[in-house]
Amino acid sequence: MKFVGAHVSAAGGVDQAVIRAHELEATAFALFTKNQRQWRAAPLAEDVIEKFKQACEQYGYTSAQILPHDSYLINLGHPVTEALEKSREAFIDEMLRCQQLGLSLLNFHPGSHLLQIDEGKCLARIAESINIALDATEGVTAVIENTAGQGSNLGFKFEHLAAIIDGVEDKSRVGVCIDTCHAFAAGYDLRTEADCQHTFGALGDIVGFEYLRGMHLNDAKSEFNSRVDRHHSLGEGNIGKTVFSYIMHDPRFDNIPLILETVNPDIWAEEIAWLKSQAEI
């Protein structure tokens, strides 16, 4: 079973994200559980939590179909202790919000060394940050997203993801989300079926498909191996549609959220319908 959707707005309350996903005829969705550009947010009120859970039940979404994303401000590999602590506290808060909403996944960008510490130290800090968050929460899996490798962001190599997982004590609560645009921009080609076989073969060998908890399905405005993160609508960018059809046919991508973060929300329903049609061919 393929779960396909988009990262929808939670404006007006997290329950509104569920309704928006349903209106797209999505079978999965992503959301922010708070303003992603602020450090702090008011705690989730009981009535808000209840409305969200009721909406999920009404429209048939389980936690396996929902991939919340944390704040972009968080850097779990920050080289400066005070800033690292601030990020860790914010990440625990994000995990707790997911826990309150009955969600089982939290997607996040791993972190950046800011040219102040080496890659190895930064990756170890990220793993330690995850361990601290897992100790402080229950039932939520930390889902590390691969990056395009802009600036000093880590996570652009599958080896980075594997190194972080290696440092996490509870392997049952850590996973990865692969963004097709980020992978392409980081030098993992996806333009042909042979490219897909090679790239996903490497993912299986280096990270392991047992850790795959979600996908972000994005075409790329950015060039191959450019280390630039610029999303595009499916089939309109430099990757093309082959990989998205490939994913919809491959059972290794079953039963996880497959989430659009493409640039034109007006055609999300169309893109979701096209992806579903590929699964049926």
From Swiss-Prot:
The cofactors named for this UniProt entry are:
Zn(2+)
What exactly does this protein do? Answer: Endonuclease IV plays a role in DNA repair. It cleaves phosphodiester bonds at apurinic or apyrimidinic (AP) sites, generating a 3'-hydroxyl group and a 5'-terminal sugar phosphate.
One MF term in GO for this entry? zinc ion binding
Is the keyword Hydrolase in the record? yes
CDD domains assigned to the protein according to its UniProt record, in alphabetical order: AP2Ec (cd00019)
Give the UniProt record's GO annotations in the biological process aspect: base-excision repair
> Which gene produces this protein?
nfo
Q: Name one Pfam family in it.
A: AP_endonuc_2
Specify the domain of life of the species encoding this protein: Bacteria
Q: Which residues bind Zn(2+) 2?
A: E145, D179, H216, E261
What reactions does this protein catalyze? Endonucleolytic cleavage to 5'-phosphooligonucleotide end-products
Listed EC numbers: 3.1.21.2
Q: What is this protein called?
A: Probable endonuclease 4
Any binding details for the cofactor?
Binds 3 Zn(2+) ions.
Family classification: Belongs to the AP endonuclease 2 family.
- Keywords assigned by UniProt, alphabetized: DNA damage, DNA repair, Endonuclease, Hydrolase, Metal-binding, Nuclease, Zinc
| Protein residues bound to Zn(2+) 1 | H69, H109, E145
Q: Which residues bind Zn(2+) 3?
A: H182, D229, H231
